[in-house]
């Protein structure tokens, strides 16, 4: 498919269609010995277009038999049609290369021998010309020594037009065709001589597929998942193959290998209990699970995945076929779905959604697998060490296995919906097999664990979603979480290794906690778990938990967050297992401990309020404790994580008992879990920490208790509960059922809570809390060095708690905040108010909703989210690329509300100073970044969920957009930073230059851009507004999910429109028409559209949007010719449409010369410039400038002075005219356009503010300004010929002038300064400006202009100096963006095709959207400059330039950089020059008039004289006659 970016680049350009004809004359080909070509074909090709000549035989030469020729006795002509593009102000066409390829045709196969490229733009011209060409081709085969092709090339211009005209489109480039069968020459692998030195041959041989035993076992999976990369299979397969025989599975290995249906049936027959059961369709009822007869499994589903021995234990994971690509919000089928199937008859949706996300999670898991295996081993050790625990299950184990198998079967049915799950299963299988090899008990446990664990491991990522989904479908909430990034898994791996060392200890905890992931699944099963047999579950849970916990750990804290987030369910299940393991004791502990925890938390909050210093110390201690705990947790990470889950469950139970308060407790528990996770993460981050963790773990739960005591008591209790849980594990048997009952209760409560309206807040909260805690604790580590920050945190917490209307909620929030907020405070340390606002917003939400528990949870989640964001912010400063990803993740994780709240604090930390930020960042950056990435992955996973999570994601995305502006001195600088364009400069700018005052302004600007002015408490207002999701105009598109949801929302209610993806949903054009009709009903008659008329529907929509100013990327042919439209093009086009329709188009604030990136902001209406910028002020400026004119020759200066009064008066007139005309309002720095002409460029933001005219091109230093134009230069302004000459001169003097490259460079810089679109008029200094440190935070601190540049400036005298400079700067900026966009598009397309890394794909999509928005801003700005440059009417030109100057003068002098000041000087010079020209015109007119009057008088006198003379003659005649 044609490049999306190239289409975007063509917008606004001129196109010319040429017909090129190549006439072949001779081909000379020299070959190596022992080989000669058979038939030779010359191919003229570009992309997928191939024009082939006839096949000709090669005739060896007489002198050199290895050098032969092909001679065309009758020249052979081949012709092609090519569309070439050029900028409107340039005559040279852009390069377009076509390639000549020499191919050898032998036995029906073609091999490439040599190639050469020809740039057709060099041969294109208005006049047909024939050019003889002799091409030296580059050999592509070792068999070719030399090749030359002689031909004649001619080009004929067919027609010219706009790049977007229908007849300019190349159908061939619209078609997405697979390349032909001509492969790169493998150098004829069949020849023996090539084996030694022919690189192609070995490769070719290596490519030959060789049977792989492990793959044979997975034939079904592979076939089902064909086309989807399964990187993990290879890794897992060897171990699977090895483990197959030892696996204690009753089913023999051979049956496992059987293919598809047969395999499953045979396995069932042969392997009584364990035989792989055919995956059950999601409809399978829970009874099927409970039943233990494999025979009962439904007939093998179409493609049951037969896994090797132990694989059978694992539920085959169904692929989500259609859903996979969507990454829908439904929880992944994996574990959750299996249980969901039981709990709900319709888990398929969730499953499919899960499938979509499974992909990434699987990969992550793959990386985490090694650790998972270690965990498994540790678990095995554990099971061996604790025969009781395993023993409990041992009896029913066979039954348990069956049950598990069946569950796995059920899951399998669901699992098949998600290919990712399959991969996860493969990984887990290997783990399971490890366990199996060690012992039947372990095997029994592990298989079951695998059955559950496998899905579970995946579910964690999706659990993040689960959090969201859980609320929707309480039971089916388990979704497979995307695995955390490989980096995380690597770190986790280290931790896991340490844990493996302390395996037994952990196992106790893991048995409890290990279940969390698995039990998360159990949650949904809740009662079904009990029905199946709690003990077997427990044992299996242990194994599974261990594996799961390890998997979770390997996946990363992010996974845990997802679990916690998803969590109500996961934790509940975890609790089910954990509770079972812990037994009643844990109940008691939890029951007694949690209330105490609340009290303690409240007390802690109070103490924090009273003693900030103490709180700091405590916080540092807490941070240390958290780390210690993290270490312990890491040991028991599984245990801890699970334990938190257990605690959460207990809390849930208590919730049942305590009612609403229980919810808070649950959240608190979640927060604790997150804290633990965070700590673990921090431990993971540092190997030393890991060691410490191991040590602390070794020390025993006592340490955990001690640490817990340091941490809020709730956490301490949690750890204690976990500790007790270990002890209770022994007593597990007795308390299992009770625990299960409690678990069921907690599950129900959790489900209820979820239903009540957590809206995914639990998931978000958990994820957010975890992320926050993770980041927070890391921050805490950082903060430990910054007591002040912690003190602030304390204050914030106090404020939040006190301000909260719901004390319980506040307590929970405070608790979370204590765990996470304190650290956040450290981050946001300077901004207690913001946090308090956040708390207030949370309270407000809680109060308004009336659901204190859930609301409080939401508030907490937001707080956590906020912290997370804050954490990210400091990181962003130092590692912007990471930050961007992290921010995205965070945004997704948190709701938009949270983000806004977070933003303020985030910016504040920067305000606090780079030192603090650096201190925080330095210690935690790497870990935080990783954590954030993990979270990001999770966030991305559930951010993509289509359900509520989707809504949250969209808002978050919006928040991200707003956030970036605030965080990064420029709305888009942040994103640029993400793209790596700005680099660290942005962070420095933000830190150094952002002032608290500017932050609010930036927020206001972004808020305005979003179309939602903020209330006095922006956080509250934004949160309240955005909760519904659609009330406030969305910010710039930042994720594919948010874009999809916006489209769905906007097209709701339109006939025949159902949007579920970015491809087929848009093909018939009705969806585009619906969006157009929604915002511009007068542009299209929707009722008259025919759903079957694809071409016409799309044409109407595209034409309508093009008329409004939306860059035209799609053509009706795209939709007609392709049954599945190109996803990236559709997404990009919709991104533009959304930005336009919501008024969120980017505005170019200023361009930076010298390679610096420009500054952009969301196009929001800006207040008009101060009134003092009236004509009088302008005139004064002009007058003063004319007087100063340092470089002007005296003569010119005198003229300028003399003209000043006239200038002033004219300025006044022009100024008033512009004001009256409304030009000022649109102030879009669309200098060249009059408001009526759509200065806003259809952006819908007439107040888009003028661009800050900045002319970095001259290198930011006020260089010598050329004197005003010599007089007389415009004496014949209206002479058409002169106008044409003038334009040609302008072209020559522009950047394209060959003789004065310096001038071009300078112009480019200047152009850059103003390149943006309706460049926002700098009204009051925009946030971006204020953020720009006067010294040069702006990337363009350029050296003084070189003499060559000064000369270039002089050359601008004949044209518009200002406009030329701006255009050249614009070109520089475009080159930068184009270079990055080409890379991003390639990466994005490869990721979209493979679906391998959804997280990375989402990050790239956000960067892509940002680049597209910037490109459109530059296009709009270029249009303005083009209009300005072509404007020849002096009056109008003067008006436009004066408007530009007004926009610049709206900025305070002290805020202007040297480049801006120089640009202003250029503008003044241009205006002075214009005034001089006008004066000259007036003088000329006066002079001509005087001459004319004199002539008239002379003629009159002459006539009078003639009359007198005639009269005298007549009188004489009369006399004569009379006489």
From Swiss-Prot:
Q: Where is this motif: CAAX motif?
A: 1520-1523
The UniProt record lists the C2 NT-type domain at: 8-157
Stored InterPro entries: bMERB_dom, CH_dom, CH_dom_sf, F-actin_Monoox_Mical, NT-C2
Q: Which domain of life does this protein belong to?
A: Eukaryota
Q: Which residues carry this modification: Phosphothreonine?
A: 454
Region Disordered: start-end pairs: 179-536, 963-1036, 1183-1352
Modification(s) after translation: Prenylated. Farnelysation (predominant) and geranylgeranylation has been observed in vitro.
Identify the keywords attached in UniProt to this record, alphabetized.
Answer: Coiled coil, Endosome, Phosphoprotein
Q: Which Pfam family is one of those matched by this entry?
A: CH
- Which PANTHER family does the entry mention? CALPONIN HOMOLOGY DOMAIN-CONTAINING PROTEIN DDB_G0272472-RELATED, EH DOMAIN-BINDING PROTEIN 1-LIKE PROTEIN 1
Q: What's this protein's function?
A: May act as Rab effector protein and play a role in vesicle trafficking.
What is this protein identified as? EH domain-binding protein 1-like protein 1
Q: Which organism is it from?
A: Homo sapiens
This protein's gene is called EHBP1L1
């Amino acid at each position: 498919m044609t490049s999306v970016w190239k289409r975007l680049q063509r917008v606004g350009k001129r196109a010319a269609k040429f017909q090129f004809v190549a006439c072949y004359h001779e081909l000379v080909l020299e070959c190596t010995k022992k080989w000669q070509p058979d038939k030779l074909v010359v191919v003229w090709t570009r992309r997928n277009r191939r024009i082939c000549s006839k096949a000709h035989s090669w005739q060896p030469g007489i002198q050199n038999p290895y050098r032969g020729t092909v001679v065309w006795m009758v020249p052979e002509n081949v012709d092609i049609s090519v569309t070439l593009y050029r900028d409107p102000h340039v005559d040279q066409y852009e390069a377009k290369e076509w390639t000549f390829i020499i191919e050898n045709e032998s036995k029906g196969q073609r091999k490439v021998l040599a190639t050469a490229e020809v740039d057709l733009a060099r041969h294109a011209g208005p006049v047909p010309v024939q050019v003889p060409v002799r091409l030296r081709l580059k050999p592509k085969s070792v068999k070719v020594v030399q090749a030359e092709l002689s031909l004649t090339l001619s080009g004929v211009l067919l027609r010219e037009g706009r790049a977007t005209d229908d007849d300019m489109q190349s159908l061939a480039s619209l078609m997405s065709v697979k390349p032909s069968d001509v492969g790169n020459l493998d150098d004829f692998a069949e020849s023996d001589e090539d084996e030694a030195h022919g690189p192609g041959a070995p490769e070719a041989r290596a490519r030959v597929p060789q049977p792989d035993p492990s793959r044979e076992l997975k034939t079904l999976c592979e076939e089902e998942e064909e086309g989807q990369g399964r990187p993990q299979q290879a890794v897992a397969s060897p171990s699977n193959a090895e483990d197959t025989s030892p696996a204690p599975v009753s089913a023999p290995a051979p049956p496992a290998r059987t293919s598809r249906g047969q395999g499953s049936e045979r396995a069932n027959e042969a392997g009584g209990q364990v035989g792989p059961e055919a995956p059950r369709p999601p409809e399978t009822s829970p009874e099927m699970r409970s039943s233990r007869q494999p025979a009962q499994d439904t007939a093998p589903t179409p493609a049951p995945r037969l896994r090797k021995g132990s694989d059978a234990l694992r539920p085959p994971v169904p692929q989500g076929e259609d859903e996979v690509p969507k990454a829908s919000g439904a929880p992944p089928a994996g574990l959750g779905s299996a249980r969901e199937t039981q709990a709900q008859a319709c888990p398929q949706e969730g499953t499919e959604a899960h499938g979509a996300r499974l992909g990434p999670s699987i990969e992550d898991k793959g990386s985490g697998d090694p650790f998972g295996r270690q965990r498994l081993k540790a678990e095995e050790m554990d099971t061996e060490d604790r025969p009781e625990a395993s023993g409990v299950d041992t009896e029913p184990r066979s039954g348990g296995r069956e049950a598990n198998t069946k569950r796995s079967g059920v899951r399998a049915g669901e699992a098949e919906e998600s290919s990712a799950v399959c991969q996860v299963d493969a990984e887990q299988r290997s783990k399971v097999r490890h366990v199996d090899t060690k012992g039947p008990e372990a095997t029994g446990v592990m298989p079951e664990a695998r059955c559950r664990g496998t899905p579970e491991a995946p579910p964690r990522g999706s659990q993040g979603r689960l959090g969201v989904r859980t609320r929707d479908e309480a039971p089916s909430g388990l979704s497979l979480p995307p695995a955390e990034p490989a980096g995380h898994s690597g770190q986790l791996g280290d931790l896991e290794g340490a844990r493996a060392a302390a395996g037994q200890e952990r196992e106790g905890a893991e048995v409890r906690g290990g279940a969390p992931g698995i039990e998360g699944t159990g949650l949904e099963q809740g009662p079904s778990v009990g029905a199946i047999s709690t003990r077997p579950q427990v044992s299996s849970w242990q194994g599974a938990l261990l594996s799961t916990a390890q998997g979770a750990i390997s996946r990363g804290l992010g996974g845990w967050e997802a679990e916690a987030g998803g969590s109500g369910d996961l934790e509940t299940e975890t609790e089910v297992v954990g509770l079972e393991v812990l037994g009643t004791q844990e109940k008691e502990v939890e029951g007694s401990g949690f209330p105490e925890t609340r009290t303690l938390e409240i007390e802690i909050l109070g103490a924090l309020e009273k003693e900030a210093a103490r709180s700091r110390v405590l916080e540092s201690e807490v941070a240390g404790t958290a780390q210690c705990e993290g270490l312990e947790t890491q040991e028991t990470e599984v245990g801890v994580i699970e334990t938190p889950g257990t605690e959460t469950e207990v809390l849930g139970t208590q919730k049942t008992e305590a009612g609403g308060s229980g919810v808070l407790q649950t959240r608190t528990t979640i927060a604790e879990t997150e804290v633990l996770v965070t700590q673990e993460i921090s431990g993971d981050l540092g190997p030393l920490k890991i060691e410490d963790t191991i040590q602390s773990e070794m020390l025993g739960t006592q340490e955990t208790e001690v640490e817990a005591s340091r941490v809020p008591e709730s956490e301490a209790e949690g750890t204690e509960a976990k500790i007790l849980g270990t002890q209770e594990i022994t007593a597990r048997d007795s308390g299992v059922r009770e625990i299960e009952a409690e678990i069921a209760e907690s599950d129900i409560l959790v489900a209820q809570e979820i239903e009540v309206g957590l809206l995914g807040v639990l998931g978000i909260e958990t994820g957010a809390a975890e992320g926050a805690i993770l980041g927070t604790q890391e921050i805490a580590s950082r903060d430990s060095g910054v007591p002040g920050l912690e003190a602030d945190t304390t204050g914030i917490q106090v404020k939040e708690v006190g301000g909260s209307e719901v004390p319980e909620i506040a307590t929970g929030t405070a608790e979370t905040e204590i765990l996470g907020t304190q650290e956040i405070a450290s981050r946001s340390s300077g901004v207690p108010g913001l946090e308090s606002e956040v708390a207030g917003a949370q309270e407000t939400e809680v109060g308004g909703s009336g659901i204190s528990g859930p609301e409080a949870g939401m508030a907490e989640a937001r707080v956590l989210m906020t912290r997370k964001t804050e954490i990210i912010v400091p990181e962003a400063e130092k590692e912007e690329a990471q930050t961007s990803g992290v921010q995205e993740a965070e945004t997704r994780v948190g709701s938009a509300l949270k983000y806004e709240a977070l933003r303020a604090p985030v910016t504040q930390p920067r305000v606090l100073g780079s030192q603090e930020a650096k201190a925080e960042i330095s210690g935690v950056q790497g870990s935080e970044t990783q954590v954030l990435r993990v979270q990001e992955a999770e966030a991305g996973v559930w951010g993509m969920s289509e359900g509520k999570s989707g809504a949250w994601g969209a808002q978050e995305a919006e928040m991200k957009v707003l956030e970036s502006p605030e965080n990064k001195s420029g709305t888009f600088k942040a994103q640029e930073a993400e793209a790596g364009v700005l680099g660290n400069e942005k962070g420095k700018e933000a830190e150094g230059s952002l002032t608290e005052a500017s932050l609010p302004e930036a927020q206001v600007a972004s808020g305005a851009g979003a179309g939602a002015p903020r209330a006095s408490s922006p956080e509250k207002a934004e949160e309240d507004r955005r909760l519904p999701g659609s009330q406030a105009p969305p910010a710039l598109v930042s994720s594919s999910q948010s874009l999809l949801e916006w489209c769905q929302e906007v097209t709701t209610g339109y006939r025949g429109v159902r949007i579920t993806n970015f491809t087929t949903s848009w093909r018939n054009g009705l969806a585009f028409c619906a969006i157009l009709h929604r915002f511009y009903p007068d542009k299209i008659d929707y009722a008259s559209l025919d759903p079957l008329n694809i071409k016409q529907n799309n044409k109407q929509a595209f034409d309508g949007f093009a008329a409004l100013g939306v860059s035209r990327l799609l053509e009706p042919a795209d939709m007609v010719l392709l049954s599945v439209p190109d996803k990236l093009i559709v997404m990009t086009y919709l991104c533009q449409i959304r930005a336009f329709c919501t008024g969120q188009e980017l505005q170019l604030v200023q361009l930076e010369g010298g390679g610096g990136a420009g500054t952009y902001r969301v196009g929001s209406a800006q207040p008009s410039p101060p009134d003092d910028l009236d004509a009088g002020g302008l005139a004064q400026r002009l007058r003063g400038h004319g007087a100063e004119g340092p470089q002007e020759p005296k003569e010119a200066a005198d003229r300028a002075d003399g003209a000043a009064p006239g200038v002033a008066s004219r300025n006044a007139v022009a100024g008033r005219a512009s004001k009256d005309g409304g030009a000022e309002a649109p102030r879009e720095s669309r200098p060249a356009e009059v408001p009526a002409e759509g200065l806003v460029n259809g952006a819908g933001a007439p107040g888009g503010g003028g661009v800050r005219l900045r002319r970095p091109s001259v290198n930011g230093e006020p260089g010598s300004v050329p004197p005003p134009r010599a007089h007389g230069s415009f004496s014949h302004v209206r002479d058409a010929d002169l106008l044409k000459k003038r334009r040609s001169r302008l072209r020559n003097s522009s950047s394209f002038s060959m003789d004065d490259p310096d001038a071009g460079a300078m112009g480019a810089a200047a152009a850059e300064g103003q390149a943006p679109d309706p460049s926002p008029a700098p009204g009051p200094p925009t946030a971006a400006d204020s953020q720009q440190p006067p010294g040069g935070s702006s990337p363009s601190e350029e050296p003084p202009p070189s003499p060559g540049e000064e000369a270039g400036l002089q050359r601008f005298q004949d044209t518009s100096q200002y406009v030329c400079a701006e255009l050249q700067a614009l070109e520089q900026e475009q080159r930068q963006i184009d270079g990055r966009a080409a890379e991003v598009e390639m990466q994005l397309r490869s990721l979209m095709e493979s679906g391998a890394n959804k997280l990375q794909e989402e990050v790239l999509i956000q960067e892509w959207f940002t680049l597209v928005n910037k490109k459109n801003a530059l296009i709009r700005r270029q249009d303005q400059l083009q209009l300005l440059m072509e404007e020849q009417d002096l009056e109008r030109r003067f008006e436009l330039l004066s408007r530009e100057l007004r926009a610049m003068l709206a900025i305070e002098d002290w805020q202007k950089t040297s480049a801006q000041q120089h640009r202003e000087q250029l503008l003044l010079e241009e205006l002075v020059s214009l005034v001089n020209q006008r004066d000259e015109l007036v003088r000329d007119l006066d002079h001509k008039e005087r001459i004319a009057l004199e002539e008239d008088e002379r003629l009159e006198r002459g006539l009078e004289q003639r009359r007198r003379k005639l009269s005298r003659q007549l009188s004489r005649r009369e006399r004569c006659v009379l006489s």
